[in-house]
Amino acid sequence: LEQKKVYTTELFKNWFEVVGTLVFLAEQKDVKESSKLKSIRKETDLMKEKYMVGNKAFRGLERLVNMYQDDAMNHFRREVSLADESDYRRVCYFFAGFPIHTIAWLMDEKVENVYQRRLRLRKFIASSAFAHKELYERLLSK
């Protein structure tokens, strides 16, 4: 329980830091709109690296998914052999319930490609005999 509290608190702290920075950039009165957009893009890219893409940040997200989604990523890693770590990262984002456009941004992919990958993964799981098949199907149906 204490571990859940620590991870959840850290997640909210990071989220509010992100929101606060974006609001600050957007509300600057004496800056041209094009400069604001460049600043916001730069800041979101930095935040992506700091909070979502780095290994430490990702391990924290995976722990949260395991805590709140019935140990889904641990089961998935044991049961399913994927090509590389980025595939597991994408699955974790799916299991966490991230919107498709957010996953595309995080993975530097086109939105259509993320939809296709999720569809192929759903078909693969549907035709499998994994012990936690129902859990995976539920998490991918969001």
Model segments located where?
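Alpha-helix capping and helix-coil boundary motifs
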Residues: 3-4, 32-36, 99, 131
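Cytosolic signal-transmission helices at domain junctions
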Residues: 1-13
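Long alpha-helical scaffolds in very large eukaryotic tether/adaptor proteins
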Residues: 11-25
